[in-house]
Amino acid sequence: LWNYAILPMGETPEKDDGQILVPFAVESSLSGVGKRLGDRNELWYNRTFTVSPKWNGKRVLLHFGAVDWKADVWVNGVCVGTHTGGFTPFEFDITAALKKGDNELKVRVWDPTDAGCQPRGKQVNRPEGIWYTPVSGIWQTVWLEAVPQQYIRNIRTTPDLDRKLFRVETAACGAQPGDVIEVRLYDNGTKVAEGRALSGAPVE
């Protein structure tokens, strides 16, 4: 359970309204709240968490599966990032904001629903005909991940059947000039291809 508060835009909570079960939207009864947010209010979440001593020396990433719609995130009072968009996952490197013991996580969410210009599907503030309510706030899983100081953040693969090639593009964090990315392609445990390229360049 997380703590939550609903306040007019621009105001900061001095106390919580109650608790909310994440990752259910605040409008959902499954969240334990079942309240409408509206485009003139903001939804605040807060909770504490600890980081395992086994993660010392590693980078710590805070992942959100999805938050509808605009999210601002703080760890121990430090703004670690902002994300806009209700349907895509995102993460922030929160290593520099962490401390020993309890860490405080705060998330501020604004969701104008049909008062804004974002894609919203069937979500409307005043449903008629169908009773599909807005889906505001954290509605997918939130989790922490420990990664090495150098790690691959994302991989994009593109097969080229005409040229009999397999193109791999990587986004490496913490890579140094001259670092090499090496890719091996296996088919049922048998290596069928391999390639090397400098970090930032595609491997074919």
Task: Provide a role label for each language-model segment.
Residues 21-30:
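Solvent-exposed edge beta-strands and adjacent loop segments
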Residues 86, 158-164, 199-201:
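Ser/Thr- and Asn-enriched, surface-exposed coil loops between beta-strands
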Residues 20, 62, 105-107, 168, ...:
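Hydrophobic beta-strand residues in large extracellular and virion-surface proteins
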Residues 1-21:
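Predominantly extracellular/luminal regions of secreted and cell-surface proteins
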